[in-house]
């Protein structure tokens, strides 16, 4: 099973059919007021004594720029039609493969560039200049390449900036959904029920959803529930193993599946309440190297590190 978003008017009929399993919140939308500033803070903390410290600090600057760009470029959008179509077809309402993008994300990119310029070193400035000079058509081609995972068509130096703007755009749209929709169970649980993208990592929460695992979308920043002890990629339960660099009590582990040969990191807030889906994944690339040595392929993509980067 997976999660499907339905229009608000369908809630009454669904409540009559509710089960115990459905009392678990199937979908969590991001708190955009603090998401990017918290991510930037976490990245800076993790950069200390980390071999990838310089890149983590760069990622922190980009996350901070996202925080400001979000504030400076509010979005108003009626998603009623998209919700109705998604509910009828069983597809995500903000399906990245077919959703008609507006040029709002171009404005977000311009804001990101303006925020990053004052601190950017020369090699980053050259990339920002190139992106700023790109036509709308060229930007859309770059976006298509990233969203379709055709990474050979976009330079690895441009990818994080394009994705940062696209992610902001999708996160803003996702933030408009909660008052109009809820989630129910369906199929294709390995994909985000909001936009159809893939996770960056998974988080076992504390608080009101304590002990529950949620996959964190690498595009729209939403999180969706997937039960533990089940592969998030193929849903098998037979051959799961958990790997860590430090000890069994590590806050970041890799969950590997012998059936499909993939792995996804799992972050435990009970071990460290400050873990963050994107930051802690990026800061533990040594664990990725270990998993590759063991013959497992990563089933996720970090928005700061695309294949070929």
UniProtKB/Swiss-Prot annotation:
It holds the Pfam family FdhE_central. GO terms for biological process: protein maturation. Keywords: Cytoplasm. Disulfide bonds: none annotated. GO terms for molecular function: ferric iron binding. It is found in: Cytoplasm. SUPFAM superfamilies: FdhE-like. It comes from the Bacteria. One of its GO terms (cellular component) is cytosol. Belongs to the FdhE family. Necessary for formate dehydrogenase activity. This is Protein FdhE homolog. It comes from Serratia proteamaculans (strain 568). The gene is fdhE.
């Amino acid at each position: 099973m997976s999660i499907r978003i339905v229009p608000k008017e369908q809630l009454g009929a669904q409540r009559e059919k509710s089960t115990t399993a459905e009392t678990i919140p199937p979908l969590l939308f991001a708190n955009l007021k603090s998401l990017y500033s918290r991510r930037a803070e976490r990245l800076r903390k993790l950069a200390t004594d980390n071999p990838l410290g310089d890149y983590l600090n760069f990622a922190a600057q980009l996350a901070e720029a996202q925080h400001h760009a979000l504030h400076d470029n509010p979005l108003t959008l009626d998603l009623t039609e998209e919700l109705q179509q998604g509910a009828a077809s069983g597809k995500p309402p903000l399906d990245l493969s077919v959703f008609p993008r507006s040029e709002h994300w171009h404005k977000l990119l311009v804001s990101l560039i303006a925020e990053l310029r004052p601190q950017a070193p020369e090699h980053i400035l050259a990339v920002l200049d190139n992106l700023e000079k790109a036509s709308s058509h060229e930007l859309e081609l770059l976006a298509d390449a990233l969203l379709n995972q055709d990474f050979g068509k976009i330079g690895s130096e441009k990818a994080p900036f394009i994705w940062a703007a696209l992610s902001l755009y999708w996160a803003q749209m996702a933030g408009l959904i909660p008052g109009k929709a809820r989630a129910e169970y369906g199929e294709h649980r390995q994909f985000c029920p909001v936009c159809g993208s893939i996770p960056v990592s998974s988080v076992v929460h504390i608080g009101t959803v304590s002990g529950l695992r949620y996959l964190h979308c690498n595009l729209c920043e939403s999180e969706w529930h997937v039960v533990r002890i089940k592969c998030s990629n193929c849903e098998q339960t037979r051959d799961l193993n958990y790997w860590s660099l430090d000890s069994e009590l590590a806050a970041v582990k890799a969950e590997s599946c012998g059936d499909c040969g993939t792995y996804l990191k799992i972050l435990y807030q009970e071990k460290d309440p400050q873990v963050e889906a994107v930051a802690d994944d990026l800061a533990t690339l040594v664990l990725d190297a270990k998993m590759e040595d063991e013959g497992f392929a990563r089933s996720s993509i970090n928005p700061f590190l695309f294949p070929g980067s």
